[in-house]
Structures are given as structure tokens and as C-alpha cells.
Swiss-Prot record:
Superkingdom of this protein's organism: Bacteria
A Pfam family it matches: NAD_synthase
SUPFAM superfamilies according to UniProt: Adenine nucleotide alpha hydrolases-like
Binding site for Mg(2+): D52, E165
Name assigned to this protein: NH(3)-dependent NAD(+) synthetase
Gene assigned in the entry: nadE
Keyword set includes DNA-binding: no
Annotated positions binding deamido-NAD(+): R140, K173, D180, H260, K261
Any one Gene Ontology cellular component term annotated for this protein: cytoplasm
Lineage, top ranks: Bacteria, Pseudomonadati, Pseudomonadota, Gammaproteobacteria, Enterobacterales
The protein's enzyme class: ligase
């Protein structure tokens, strides 16, 4: 088995999907989890205005709506969390995503004060954060807020990780990568677009250039620039297609060096890191 085949198998990626079937699969997955653990009353998700959180948010609200109708349990809710750092550059996109999702509840937590306070505390301990590490601080502060909200609403935190993100480890460890349940896991980027199109999402929310937008020195840096490959390249690779050798090397290098991000903390029983 080639490394490409191993990666595809590990991430559960498929070369083709039926959008309606995958929507149903994710919604049923969320419903089944909530029914298995009836003490869970809320799904909590940060909404950025990008493709992934818009899709995950819509699926969450659909699952909650169906469960309330089927069970009569009105205590169930989906909480969409706005988590700007100061003023968000694509604020209108975020508002458009909220309008599309129609969440039960919307909370806004501006993380700038908390990030600056943490940075100052570290500075007083003689640790000066680089712009890149400050970006990770933002991602972790966002997740911290979501877990506090989940803790106070008997909830779980929903993630947006999918195959095209997991393959490169393009997330912050214990930031946006630290979640409870990931309904998009298995899909690549273009497949996520297919689901949003089937759901009637405004096109500009999934046709915009994806960006983590964590770095102050490089605001709205496109993911594809940071990664050195395009999502079309990544999606082709995940679909088992032949890609240029340099593209394959770049993708596989990202996969191998970020393996620790896709695993629990390493123990004496693990040996993957010895490869």
C-alpha cells in the first residue's frame, strides 16, 4: 500500500460522494451521539464566516431541530459563538453565515482582551510571543471560551476538522483542533462545498479564499499560501488521483510531521514517532 493509499484510508476519504447522503450521515451522527448521552443538552460551535464552520453549524442546527421535533425535548439547543479578535475583517460574511444557519442562540465573545492579558502575563515572565505563537494563542482562547460555554450549558464542542485539513495538520493543537465531535471528518474541501451548495448556502461563503486569519503581521493570509499547495491539489490527492511529484511530497511532508496533532498525547506504548 502506498503512502497515499494509507493516508486516504486513515482519513476515511472517498473519491466521490453523494451530497444529500453525506448531509444525512452527518446529521444522523450528531443525533445519535446526543441520544446516546441524554445529559448533553447543547452543541457549541464557533462561527467564523468561513466554509467549514458554516457547514458544521448548519448540520448542527438541523440535527437539533430534528431531535426536538422527534423527541419533544425542548431543552436541546445549538449555540453559535462569535469569537472576534477586536473587529473581524470579514464581519459581513459572519453575519451572512449566521443568517443561513439560523442558530437557536448566538453568543459573542471578543477574545482580544484575554489574548492581550495572557501575552502581558507571559511578557512579565520574560517570554515575548512571536506573531505566529500569538496566533495560536488566539485559537486556544477561542476554544477555551467555547468549552466554558459548553460547561455551563451541558454541552459539547463541535469541531470543523475535515480530511483536507487533517492531512496537513492545519489547525492549532489544543486550539481549533481540540474538540469533542467532528461531523465533517472524512470530507475534502470541494466535497464540503458540494454539501453547502445542496443546502442552499450563499455561494460567497464557500467560494471565498480560506484563511485562518491568526497572524497580525500577515492578516487574512490564505491557507493555500501558508501550506504551499492548493486545496484542489490536496483534494485530488485525497481522491486517489495522480498529482505532480512535488505536490505529493509537500502534502506527505505535512502529513508526516503533523502526525502528533492527530493523536492523543504520546505515551510509552506509542511508537509511530520512531519512524
Amino acid at each position: 500500500m502506498t503512502l497515499q493509499q494509507q493516508i486516504i484510508k486513515a482519513l476515511g476519504a472517498k473519491p466521490q460522494i453523494n451530497a444529500e447522503e453525506e448531509i444525512r450521515r452527518s446529521v444522523d451522527f450528531l443525533k445519535s451521539y446526543l441520544q446516546t448521552y441524554p445529559f448533553i443538552k447543547s452543541l457549541v460551535l464557533g462561527i467564523s464566516g468561513g466554509q467549514d464552520s458554516t457547514l458544521a453549524g448548519k448540520l448542527c442546527q438541523m440535527a437539533i431541530n430534528e431531535l426536538r421535533q422527534e423527541t419533544g425535548n425542548e431543552s436541546l439547543q445549538f449555540i453559535a459563538v462569535r469569537l472576534p479578535y477586536g473587529v473581524q475583517a470579514d464581519e459581513q460574511d459572519c453575519q451572512d453565515a449566521i443568517a443561513f444557519i439560523q442558530p437557536d442562540r448566538v453568543l459573542t465573545v471578543n477574545i482580544k482582551g484575554a489574548v492581550l492579558a495572557s501575552e502581558q502575563a507571559l511578557r512579565e515572565a520574560c517570554i515575548e510571543l512571536s506573531d505566529f505563537v500569538r496566533g495560536n494563542e488566539k485559537a486556544r482562547e477561542r476554544m477555551k471560551a467555547q468549552y466554558s460555554i459548553a460547561g455551563m450549558t451541558s454541552g459539547v464542542v463541535v469541531g470543523t476538522d475535515h480530511a483536507a485539513e487533517a492531512i496537513t495538520g492545519f489547525f492549532t493543537k489544543y486550539g481549533d483542533g481540540g474538540t469533542d465531535i467532528n461531523p465533517l471528518y472524512r470530507l475534502n474541501k470541494r466535497q464540503g462545498k458540494q454539501l453547502l451548495a445542496a443546502l442552499g448556502c450563499p455561494e460567497h461563503l464557500y467560494k471565498k479564499a480560506p484563511t485562518a486569519d491568526l497572524e497580525d503581521d500577515r492578516p487574512s493570509l490564505p491557507d493555500e499560501v501558508a501550506l504551499g499547495v492548493t486545496y484542489d491539489n490536496i483534494d485530488d490527492y485525497l481522491e486517489g488521483k495522480n498529482v505532480p511529484q512535488q505536490v505529493a511530497r509537500t502534502i506527505e511532508n505535512w502529513y508526516l510531521k503533523t502526525e502528533h496533532k492527530r493523536r492523543p498525547p504520546i505515551t510509552v506504548f506509542d511508537d509511530f514517532w520512531k519512524k
